[in-house]
């Protein structure tokens, strides 16, 4: 059996520009591509945190060290400069690959510089203000105790 698994993600990247009159794709800083193990032409899902839009496209390498996250083509109708996005790549793996594989999870700052690299798809970096599913039982217990 083959399974489609999250291979890598760049979490909470800031869109630096959007160009409607472009052939298509998303331009990603080559440093971020390397950190997330993304190749030029690789399919990615883009999730816009600000408006909920989800779309699929492919990656084009941007200038190394530039922090570029550029939305190109028709996707520019859905995602705007300044929006926070998650770029997710999936891979189709057999049972053995699934057991041995660790995804690449890259958290970035407002300038799209990597600040946290890991392999846990549900990890939230310390001080990020994000809630991880692994925290829900603790949060539920805190809520219940505050109601008493």
From Swiss-Prot:
| Oligomer status and interactors | Heterooctamer of four alpha and four beta subunits.
Key words, A-Z: Autocatalytic cleavage, Cytoplasm, Decarboxylase, Lyase, Pantothenate biosynthesis, Pyruvate, Schiff base, Zymogen
Which protein family is it in?
A: Belongs to the PanD family.
**UniProt cross-references to CDD domains, sorted A to Z:** Asp_decarbox
The protein's enzyme class:
lyase
Residues binding substrate, per UniProt: 57, 73-75
Reproduce the UniProt comment on modification after translation: Is synthesized initially as an inactive proenzyme, which is activated by self-cleavage at a specific serine bond to produce a beta-subunit with a hydroxyl group at its C-terminus and an alpha-subunit with a pyruvoyl group at its N-terminus.
Identify the pathway.
Cofactor biosynthesis; (R)-pantothenate biosynthesis; beta-alanine from L-aspartate: step 1/1
Q: Does the keyword Ribosomal protein apply?
A: no
Q: Does the keyword Cytoplasm apply?
A: yes
Q: Pfam families this protein is in?
A: Asp_decarbox
Q: Report the co-factor binding details.
A: Binds 1 pyruvoyl group covalently per subunit.
Full protein name: Aspartate 1-decarboxylase
Compartment(s): Cytoplasm
Identify the cofactor(s): pyruvate
Could you tell me the superkingdom of the organism this chain comes from? Bacteria
E.C. number: 4.1.1.11
Q: Which reaction does it catalyse?
A: L-aspartate + H(+) = beta-alanine + CO2
Entry function: Catalyzes the pyruvoyl-dependent decarboxylation of aspartate to produce beta-alanine.
- Supply the InterPro entries for this chain: Asp_de-COase-like_dom_sf, Asp_decarbox
| Molecular function as annotated in GO | aspartate 1-decarboxylase activity
Extract the signal peptide range.
none
């Amino acid at each position: 059996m083959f399974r489609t698994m999250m291979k890598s993600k760049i979490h909470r990247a800031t869109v630096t520009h959007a160009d409607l009159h472009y052939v298509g794709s998303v331009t990603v800083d080559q440093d971020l591509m390397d950190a997330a193990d993304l190749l030029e032409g690789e399919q990615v899902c883009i999730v816009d945190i600000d408006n909920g839009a989800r779309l699929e496209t492919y990656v084009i390498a941007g200038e190394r060290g530039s922090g570029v996250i550029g939305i190109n083509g028709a996707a520019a109708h859905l995602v705007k400069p300044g929006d926070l996005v998650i770029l997710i790549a999936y891979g189709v793996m057999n049972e053995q690959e699934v057991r041995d594989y660790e995804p690449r999870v890259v958290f970035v700052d407002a300038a799209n510089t990597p600040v946290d690299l890991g392999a846990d798809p549900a990890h939230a970096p310390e001080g990020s203000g994000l809630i991880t599913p692994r925290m829900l039982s603790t949060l539920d217990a805190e809520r219940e105790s505050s109601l008493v």
